[in-house]
């Protein structure tokens, strides 16, 4: 079972922002997915940390990997925590954000590739090799740009990356936010 989610940095709203990261963690764990592909994950955000009382201390990927006690109570047992990988894409004076993978299985290695198409949107492709009982799986978290031409070039970079880094015949899952609302990428 897999899931993908653009968490929009764990905050909703512009004028009166509300912290949503705690509810997101509950929802992610309730899915009971083996792999969770996340976009716009805050590795650090000093302004939000000082503004919101319950802002997570570490990176959001680490916080989301922790099992909320309410889910344990609901399931009647302690659910398994996730292994994590984080790929930083956008860096600014008060923090950074990027893509993350949460996995029920050990992550053997990770590679983060910058697929930014212009300086206004920092985008990335997080490639992880996950060690499952059935053998290794390549998992790629993608977050493509808002402009159609950018998405086309980023899709080409993704295809090139797969051809270079994923051996033929190996299991591969690619998931993410492709910003392709009109389904033009194919």
Predicted regions and their residues:
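Active-site metal-binding loops of divalent metal-dependent hydrolases
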Residues: 6-7, 41, 142-144, 171, ...
């Amino acid at each position: 079972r897999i899931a993908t989610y653009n968490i929009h940095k764990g905050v909703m709203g512009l004028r009166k922002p509300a912290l949503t990261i705690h509810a997101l963690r509950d929802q992610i764990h309730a899915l009971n997915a083996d792999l969770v592909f996340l976009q716009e994950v805050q590795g650090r955000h000093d302004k939000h940390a000082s503004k919101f009382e319950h802002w997570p201390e570490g990176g959001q990927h680490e916080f989301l990997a922790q099992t909320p006690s309410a889910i344990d109570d609901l399931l009647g047992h302690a659910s398994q925590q996730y292994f994590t990988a984080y790929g930083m894409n956008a860096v600014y004076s008060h923090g950074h954000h990027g893509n993350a993978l949460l996995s029920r299985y050990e992550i053997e290695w990770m590679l983060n590739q910058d697929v930014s198409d212009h300086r206004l949107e920092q985008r990335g492709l997080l490639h992880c090799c996950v060690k499952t009982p059935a053998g290794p799986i390549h998992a790629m978290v993608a977050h493509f740009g808002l402009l159609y031409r950018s998405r086309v070039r980023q899709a080409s970079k993704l295809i090139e990356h797969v051809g270079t880094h994923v051996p033929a015949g190996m299991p591969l899952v690619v998931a993410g936010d492709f910003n392709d609302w009109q389904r033009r990428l194919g």
